[in-house]
Amino acid sequence: MASETALFFPPKQQPLLIRLVQSVSYLVLQRLYRCGLVVSDDDVAKLRAIAGARVVYVCNHPTMEDGMVLFSLAARVGQLWHYIVAKESFKGLQGRFLQWMGCYSIRRGLGDRASIAQTLSLLKESQAQVVIFPEGGCSYQNDTVMPFRSGAIQMPLQVVAQLTKKDPDVDLYVVPISLKYRYTQPMTVIIEETLQGLERTLGIIPTEPEDFYQRLLAIASLVITRIETEFGITADTEQSWNQRIDQLRHHGIAQCEQQLNLQPNGAPIRERVYKIQALLESEEPKTVAEDDALYWTTVRLLNFDAIYDGYVAADPTPERFLDTLMRLEREVYQVEHIKPKAHRQAIFRVGEPINLKHYVKDFRQDKASTVERLTEQLRATVQENLSR
Protein backbone atom coordinates (compact mmCIF):
# COMPACT_ATOMS: atom_id res chain seq x y z
CA MET A 1 0.00 0.00 0.00
CA ALA A 2 1.29 3.48 -0.87
CA SER A 3 2.40 5.80 1.93
CA GLU A 4 0.17 8.69 2.96
CA THR A 5 2.67 11.20 1.56
CA ALA A 6 2.58 9.51 -1.84
CA LEU A 7 -1.21 9.78 -1.81
CA PHE A 8 -1.17 13.58 -1.40
CA PHE A 9 -0.67 16.15 -4.17
CA PRO A 10 0.33 19.57 -2.77
CA PRO A 11 -0.34 22.89 -4.51
CA LYS A 12 2.44 24.21 -6.74
CA GLN A 13 0.86 27.53 -7.58
CA GLN A 14 2.36 29.30 -10.61
CA PRO A 15 1.02 32.88 -10.48
CA LEU A 16 2.08 33.94 -13.98
CA LEU A 17 0.64 30.80 -15.54
CA ILE A 18 -2.58 31.23 -13.55
CA ARG A 19 -2.94 34.81 -14.78
CA LEU A 20 -2.47 33.59 -18.34
CA VAL A 21 -5.09 30.87 -17.94
CA GLN A 22 -7.43 33.31 -16.19
CA SER A 23 -7.16 35.65 -19.17
CA VAL A 24 -8.75 33.01 -21.41
CA SER A 25 -11.00 31.39 -18.80
CA TYR A 26 -14.13 33.17 -20.05
CA LEU A 27 -13.56 31.81 -23.55
CA VAL A 28 -12.77 28.31 -22.24
CA LEU A 29 -15.90 28.37 -20.10
CA GLN A 30 -18.05 29.37 -23.06
CA ARG A 31 -16.53 27.06 -25.67
CA LEU A 32 -15.58 23.91 -23.76
CA TYR A 33 -18.06 23.99 -20.89
CA ARG A 34 -20.93 25.74 -22.70
CA CYS A 35 -21.38 28.05 -19.75
CA GLY A 36 -21.48 31.77 -19.02
CA LEU A 37 -20.65 33.48 -15.74
CA VAL A 38 -23.17 35.70 -13.95
CA VAL A 39 -22.11 37.62 -10.83
CA SER A 40 -23.23 41.08 -9.77
CA ASP A 41 -20.85 44.02 -9.45
CA ASP A 42 -21.88 44.29 -5.79
CA ASP A 43 -20.83 40.70 -5.13
CA VAL A 44 -17.52 41.22 -6.93
CA ALA A 45 -16.93 44.31 -4.79
CA LYS A 46 -17.80 42.29 -1.68
CA LEU A 47 -15.06 39.77 -2.51
CA ARG A 48 -12.51 42.41 -3.43
CA ALA A 49 -13.12 44.28 -0.17
CA ILE A 50 -11.51 41.45 1.83
CA ALA A 51 -8.77 40.65 -0.68
CA GLY A 52 -5.98 41.42 1.78
CA ALA A 53 -7.25 39.05 4.46
CA ARG A 54 -7.24 35.30 4.96
CA VAL A 55 -10.41 33.93 3.35
CA VAL A 56 -12.17 30.58 3.06
CA TYR A 57 -14.83 30.40 0.36
CA VAL A 58 -17.50 27.74 0.95
CA CYS A 59 -19.70 26.90 -2.03
CA ASN A 60 -22.34 24.32 -2.84
CA HIS A 61 -21.38 21.70 -5.43
CA PRO A 62 -24.24 20.93 -7.86
CA THR A 63 -22.28 19.77 -10.93
CA MET A 64 -18.94 18.41 -12.06
CA GLU A 65 -18.20 21.73 -13.80
CA ASP A 66 -18.16 23.81 -10.60
CA GLY A 67 -14.37 23.85 -10.25
CA MET A 68 -13.85 25.57 -13.59
CA VAL A 69 -16.71 27.95 -12.87
CA LEU A 70 -15.16 28.99 -9.54
CA PHE A 71 -11.77 29.41 -11.22
CA SER A 72 -13.50 31.81 -13.63
CA LEU A 73 -15.04 33.65 -10.69
CA ALA A 74 -11.54 34.11 -9.24
CA ALA A 75 -10.49 35.52 -12.62
CA ARG A 76 -13.45 37.91 -12.59
CA VAL A 77 -12.47 39.11 -9.11
CA GLY A 78 -8.79 39.26 -10.12
CA GLN A 79 -7.47 36.97 -7.40
CA LEU A 80 -5.43 33.77 -7.03
CA TRP A 81 -7.21 31.10 -5.00
CA HIS A 82 -6.32 27.66 -3.75
CA TYR A 83 -8.77 24.80 -4.28
CA ILE A 84 -9.28 21.50 -2.48
CA VAL A 85 -9.91 18.86 -5.15
CA ALA A 86 -10.72 15.14 -4.97
CA LYS A 87 -7.54 13.08 -5.26
CA GLU A 88 -8.83 11.03 -8.20
CA SER A 89 -8.59 14.16 -10.38
CA PHE A 90 -4.78 14.26 -10.03
CA LYS A 91 -3.76 12.00 -12.88
CA GLY A 92 -0.98 12.60 -15.38
CA LEU A 93 -0.64 16.04 -16.95
CA GLN A 94 -4.08 17.06 -15.69
CA GLY A 95 -2.90 16.49 -12.14
CA ARG A 96 0.22 18.60 -12.61
CA PHE A 97 -1.84 21.35 -14.24
CA LEU A 98 -4.24 21.37 -11.28
CA GLN A 99 -1.30 21.75 -8.91
CA TRP A 100 0.04 24.68 -10.94
CA MET A 101 -3.41 26.31 -10.70
CA GLY A 102 -3.25 26.16 -6.90
CA CYS A 103 -5.21 22.95 -6.34
CA TYR A 104 -4.30 20.26 -3.84
CA SER A 105 -5.77 16.86 -3.19
CA ILE A 106 -8.01 15.32 -0.57
CA ARG A 107 -8.91 11.69 -0.07
CA ARG A 108 -12.59 11.91 0.70
CA GLY A 109 -14.08 9.64 3.32
CA LEU A 110 -10.78 9.25 5.15
CA GLY A 111 -9.00 11.41 7.68
CA ASP A 112 -6.60 12.87 5.12
CA ARG A 113 -4.02 14.28 7.52
CA ALA A 114 -1.75 15.58 4.76
CA SER A 115 -4.58 17.57 3.15
CA ILE A 116 -5.76 18.91 6.51
CA ALA A 117 -2.20 19.95 7.40
CA GLN A 118 -1.88 21.71 4.04
CA THR A 119 -5.09 23.67 4.64
CA LEU A 120 -4.04 24.69 8.14
CA SER A 121 -0.62 25.75 6.84
CA LEU A 122 -2.10 27.82 4.01
CA LEU A 123 -4.53 29.61 6.30
CA LYS A 124 -1.69 30.74 8.53
CA GLU A 125 -0.24 32.66 5.59
CA SER A 126 -1.35 36.26 5.13
CA GLN A 127 -3.80 36.76 2.24
CA ALA A 128 -4.44 33.00 1.96
CA GLN A 129 -7.60 32.27 -0.03
CA VAL A 130 -8.95 28.72 -0.11
CA VAL A 131 -12.04 27.28 -1.82
CA ILE A 132 -13.83 24.39 -0.09
CA PHE A 133 -16.90 22.43 -1.18
CA PRO A 134 -18.30 21.60 2.28
CA GLU A 135 -20.91 19.16 0.95
CA GLY A 136 -17.97 16.85 0.32
CA GLY A 137 -18.88 16.00 -3.25
CA CYS A 138 -21.20 16.72 -6.16
CA SER A 139 -24.91 16.71 -5.27
CA TYR A 140 -26.30 16.73 -8.85
CA GLN A 141 -29.07 18.99 -7.48
CA ASN A 142 -29.32 22.52 -8.80
CA ASP A 143 -31.60 23.92 -6.11
CA THR A 144 -30.88 22.10 -2.86
CA VAL A 145 -27.86 22.03 -0.56
CA MET A 146 -26.74 18.89 1.24
CA PRO A 147 -25.49 18.96 4.84
CA PHE A 148 -22.10 20.63 5.25
CA ARG A 149 -19.12 18.80 6.70
CA SER A 150 -17.84 20.50 9.81
CA GLY A 151 -14.19 20.59 8.69
CA ALA A 152 -14.83 23.57 6.41
CA ILE A 153 -15.43 25.74 9.48
CA GLN A 154 -13.42 23.84 12.09
CA MET A 155 -10.09 24.28 10.27
CA PRO A 156 -10.27 28.09 9.88
CA LEU A 157 -11.58 28.44 13.45
CA GLN A 158 -8.63 26.41 14.69
CA VAL A 159 -6.22 28.66 12.79
CA VAL A 160 -7.76 31.96 13.90
CA ALA A 161 -7.81 30.74 17.51
CA GLN A 162 -4.03 30.21 17.25
CA LEU A 163 -3.32 33.46 15.40
CA THR A 164 -5.30 35.66 17.80
CA LYS A 165 -3.07 34.59 20.68
CA LYS A 166 -0.41 36.85 19.14
CA ASP A 167 -2.64 39.34 17.35
CA PRO A 168 -6.23 39.70 18.67
CA ASP A 169 -7.21 41.76 15.63
CA VAL A 170 -6.26 39.22 12.96
CA ASP A 171 -8.97 38.71 10.34
CA LEU A 172 -10.00 35.38 8.86
CA TYR A 173 -13.22 35.38 6.86
CA VAL A 174 -15.52 32.59 5.75
CA VAL A 175 -17.62 33.57 2.73
CA PRO A 176 -20.76 31.59 1.78
CA ILE A 177 -21.15 31.37 -2.00
CA SER A 178 -24.28 30.04 -3.71
CA LEU A 179 -24.01 28.61 -7.22
CA LYS A 180 -26.85 27.55 -9.48
CA TYR A 181 -27.26 27.06 -13.21
CA ARG A 182 -29.90 28.18 -15.70
CA TYR A 183 -30.26 26.99 -19.26
CA THR A 184 -30.22 29.86 -21.73
CA GLN A 185 -32.57 28.34 -24.30
CA PRO A 186 -35.97 26.61 -24.28
CA MET A 187 -35.40 23.01 -23.17
CA THR A 188 -38.71 21.35 -24.15
CA VAL A 189 -37.24 19.56 -27.17
CA ILE A 190 -34.21 18.34 -25.22
CA ILE A 191 -36.37 17.08 -22.35
CA GLU A 192 -38.55 15.25 -24.90
CA GLU A 193 -35.50 13.66 -26.55
CA THR A 194 -34.08 12.61 -23.17
CA LEU A 195 -37.39 11.05 -22.14
CA GLN A 196 -37.66 9.23 -25.47
CA GLY A 197 -34.14 7.80 -25.16
CA LEU A 198 -34.80 6.41 -21.69
CA GLU A 199 -38.24 5.07 -22.67
CA ARG A 200 -36.78 3.35 -25.72
CA THR A 201 -34.03 1.70 -23.66
CA LEU A 202 -36.44 0.61 -20.91
CA GLY A 203 -39.21 -0.51 -23.27
CA ILE A 204 -41.74 2.01 -21.99
CA ILE A 205 -44.58 3.28 -24.17
CA PRO A 206 -45.90 6.53 -22.67
CA THR A 207 -49.66 6.63 -22.13
CA GLU A 208 -49.69 10.42 -21.87
CA PRO A 209 -46.99 11.72 -24.26
CA GLU A 210 -47.75 15.36 -23.50
CA ASP A 211 -47.33 14.94 -19.74
CA PHE A 212 -43.57 15.07 -19.17
CA TYR A 213 -43.88 14.65 -15.42
CA GLN A 214 -45.92 11.44 -15.63
CA ARG A 215 -43.41 10.08 -18.14
CA LEU A 216 -40.59 10.94 -15.73
CA LEU A 217 -42.42 9.12 -12.92
CA ALA A 218 -42.93 6.03 -15.10
CA ILE A 219 -39.21 5.89 -15.92
CA ALA A 220 -38.18 6.43 -12.31
CA SER A 221 -40.62 3.77 -11.10
CA LEU A 222 -39.22 1.16 -13.45
CA VAL A 223 -35.61 2.06 -12.61
CA ILE A 224 -36.26 1.78 -8.86
CA THR A 225 -38.05 -1.55 -9.33
CA ARG A 226 -35.17 -2.90 -11.41
CA ILE A 227 -32.62 -1.95 -8.75
CA GLU A 228 -34.78 -3.52 -6.04
CA THR A 229 -34.92 -6.73 -8.06
CA GLU A 230 -31.16 -6.67 -8.60
CA PHE A 231 -30.59 -6.22 -4.87
CA GLY A 232 -33.07 -8.95 -3.99
CA ILE A 233 -35.43 -6.52 -2.25
CA THR A 234 -39.17 -7.17 -2.30
CA ALA A 235 -40.91 -3.86 -2.91
CA ASP A 236 -43.40 -2.82 -0.25
CA THR A 237 -46.29 -1.05 -1.95
CA GLU A 238 -47.15 0.64 1.35
CA GLN A 239 -43.81 2.45 1.36
CA SER A 240 -43.34 5.87 -0.19
CA TRP A 241 -40.80 6.37 -2.96
CA ASN A 242 -38.50 8.16 -0.55
CA GLN A 243 -38.63 5.17 1.81
CA ARG A 244 -37.85 2.79 -1.05
CA ILE A 245 -34.95 4.94 -2.25
CA ASP A 246 -33.60 5.14 1.30
CA GLN A 247 -33.86 1.36 1.62
CA LEU A 248 -31.86 0.94 -1.61
CA ARG A 249 -29.16 3.30 -0.32
CA HIS A 250 -28.78 1.42 2.95
CA HIS A 251 -28.80 -1.97 1.24
CA GLY A 252 -26.17 -0.85 -1.29
CA ILE A 253 -23.77 0.61 1.28
CA ALA A 254 -24.16 -2.43 3.55
CA GLN A 255 -23.34 -4.69 0.61
CA CYS A 256 -20.18 -2.71 -0.20
CA GLU A 257 -18.99 -2.62 3.41
CA GLN A 258 -19.60 -6.33 3.83
CA GLN A 259 -17.46 -7.12 0.77
CA LEU A 260 -14.58 -5.08 2.25
CA ASN A 261 -15.11 -6.32 5.82
CA LEU A 262 -15.87 -2.80 7.04
CA GLN A 263 -17.99 -2.10 10.09
CA PRO A 264 -20.78 0.47 9.64
CA ASN A 265 -19.80 3.60 11.57
CA GLY A 266 -23.01 5.61 11.48
CA ALA A 267 -21.53 8.28 9.22
CA PRO A 268 -23.61 9.67 6.33
CA ILE A 269 -23.76 7.28 3.38
CA ARG A 270 -21.83 9.71 1.16
CA GLU A 271 -18.86 9.65 3.58
CA ARG A 272 -18.94 5.86 3.75
CA VAL A 273 -18.98 5.67 -0.06
CA TYR A 274 -15.93 7.92 -0.36
CA LYS A 275 -14.08 5.76 2.14
CA ILE A 276 -14.84 2.66 0.08
CA GLN A 277 -13.68 4.36 -3.13
CA ALA A 278 -10.45 5.46 -1.45
CA LEU A 279 -9.81 1.92 -0.23
CA LEU A 280 -10.50 0.48 -3.68
CA GLU A 281 -7.92 2.87 -5.13
CA SER A 282 -5.20 2.26 -2.54
CA GLU A 283 -5.48 -1.45 -1.79
CA GLU A 284 -4.47 -4.43 -3.90
CA PRO A 285 -7.41 -5.43 -6.09
CA LYS A 286 -9.05 -8.81 -5.62
CA THR A 287 -10.14 -9.21 -9.20
CA VAL A 288 -10.83 -6.59 -11.84
CA ALA A 289 -14.42 -7.76 -12.16
CA GLU A 290 -15.05 -7.64 -8.41
CA ASP A 291 -13.53 -4.19 -8.01
CA ASP A 292 -15.37 -2.83 -11.06
CA ALA A 293 -18.69 -4.12 -9.74
CA LEU A 294 -18.02 -2.70 -6.29
CA TYR A 295 -16.94 0.66 -7.70
CA TRP A 296 -20.05 0.86 -9.87
CA THR A 297 -22.21 0.27 -6.79
CA THR A 298 -20.52 3.25 -5.12
CA VAL A 299 -21.18 5.39 -8.21
CA ARG A 300 -24.85 4.43 -8.07
CA LEU A 301 -25.01 5.32 -4.39
CA LEU A 302 -23.58 8.78 -5.04
CA ASN A 303 -25.92 9.24 -7.98
CA PHE A 304 -28.98 8.65 -5.81
CA ASP A 305 -27.64 10.16 -2.59
CA ALA A 306 -29.43 13.51 -2.67
CA ILE A 307 -32.45 12.60 -4.79
CA TYR A 308 -35.92 12.65 -3.28
CA ASP A 309 -39.49 12.33 -4.48
CA GLY A 310 -41.03 15.76 -4.93
CA TYR A 311 -37.92 17.61 -6.12
CA VAL A 312 -39.40 18.16 -9.60
CA ALA A 313 -43.05 18.43 -8.52
CA ALA A 314 -42.26 21.25 -6.08
CA ASP A 315 -40.88 23.43 -8.89
CA PRO A 316 -40.90 21.77 -12.34
CA THR A 317 -38.19 23.90 -13.95
CA PRO A 318 -36.14 22.60 -16.89
CA GLU A 319 -33.14 22.43 -14.57
CA ARG A 320 -34.93 20.20 -12.04
CA PHE A 321 -36.35 18.00 -14.79
CA LEU A 322 -32.92 17.50 -16.28
CA ASP A 323 -31.22 17.05 -12.89
CA THR A 324 -33.45 14.02 -12.40
CA LEU A 325 -33.37 12.76 -15.97
CA MET A 326 -29.57 12.89 -16.03
CA ARG A 327 -29.47 10.85 -12.80
CA LEU A 328 -31.66 8.27 -14.50
CA GLU A 329 -29.43 8.33 -17.59
CA ARG A 330 -26.36 7.65 -15.46
CA GLU A 331 -28.12 4.62 -13.97
CA VAL A 332 -29.72 3.25 -17.14
CA TYR A 333 -26.75 3.84 -19.47
CA GLN A 334 -24.17 3.05 -16.75
CA VAL A 335 -22.26 6.28 -17.32
CA GLU A 336 -20.52 8.02 -14.42
CA HIS A 337 -20.55 11.55 -15.84
CA ILE A 338 -22.96 13.15 -18.33
CA LYS A 339 -22.25 16.50 -19.94
CA PRO A 340 -24.76 19.36 -19.63
CA LYS A 341 -27.55 19.24 -22.19
CA ALA A 342 -27.16 22.82 -23.48
CA HIS A 343 -25.55 26.18 -22.82
CA ARG A 344 -26.11 27.46 -19.28
CA GLN A 345 -25.45 30.44 -17.08
CA ALA A 346 -23.58 29.84 -13.83
CA ILE A 347 -25.17 32.27 -11.40
CA PHE A 348 -23.30 33.27 -8.24
CA ARG A 349 -24.65 34.95 -5.15
CA VAL A 350 -22.19 35.91 -2.43
CA GLY A 351 -23.29 36.03 1.20
CA GLU A 352 -21.92 38.41 3.81
CA PRO A 353 -18.38 37.44 4.90
CA ILE A 354 -18.17 36.12 8.46
CA ASN A 355 -15.11 37.26 10.39
CA LEU A 356 -14.15 34.32 12.57
CA LYS A 357 -12.18 36.42 15.04
CA HIS A 358 -15.54 37.30 16.60
CA TYR A 359 -16.15 33.62 17.38
CA VAL A 360 -12.80 32.76 18.95
CA LYS A 361 -14.06 33.18 22.52
CA ASP A 362 -17.02 30.87 21.86
CA PHE A 363 -14.74 28.37 20.12
CA ARG A 364 -12.38 28.21 23.07
CA GLN A 365 -15.26 27.68 25.47
CA ASP A 366 -17.16 25.08 23.42
CA LYS A 367 -15.49 23.93 20.21
CA ALA A 368 -18.11 21.40 19.09
CA SER A 369 -21.11 23.67 19.63
CA THR A 370 -19.49 26.66 17.93
CA VAL A 371 -18.44 24.61 14.90
CA GLU A 372 -21.88 23.03 14.61
CA ARG A 373 -23.67 26.38 14.87
CA LEU A 374 -21.51 28.14 12.28
CA THR A 375 -21.59 25.16 9.92
CA GLU A 376 -25.39 25.18 9.90
CA GLN A 377 -25.46 28.98 9.59
CA LEU A 378 -23.30 28.79 6.47
CA ARG A 379 -25.37 25.98 4.96
CA ALA A 380 -28.60 27.87 5.61
CA THR A 381 -27.19 31.03 4.02
CA VAL A 382 -26.08 29.16 0.91
CA GLN A 383 -29.52 27.53 0.63
CA GLU A 384 -31.37 30.81 1.22
CA ASN A 385 -29.39 32.63 -1.47
CA LEU A 386 -29.82 29.65 -3.79
CA SER A 387 -33.60 29.91 -3.42
CA ARG A 388 -33.78 33.63 -4.22
Question: Can you say where each PLM-predicted feature lies in the sequence?
Answer:
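Membrane-interfacial terminal anchoring regions of lipid-handling membrane enzymes
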Residues: M1-E65, L73-Q79, K87, R113-A114, ...
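Domain-scale detector for complete catalytic domains at protein termini or as standalone homologs
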Residues: S25, F97-L98, G102
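Short, basic, glycine/proline-bearing loop/turn elements
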Residues: R31-L32, W100-R107
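Short glycine-centered, acidic/aromatic-flanked micro-motifs in structured strand/loop junctions
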Residues: C59-N60, R108, P134
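Hydrophobic alpha-helical segments in the ANL/AMP-binding
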Residues: D66-A75, G92-F97
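Membrane helical hairpin/interfacial module
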Residues: L80, I84-F90, Q94-G95
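ATP-grasp fold ATP-binding core
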Residues: V130-G136
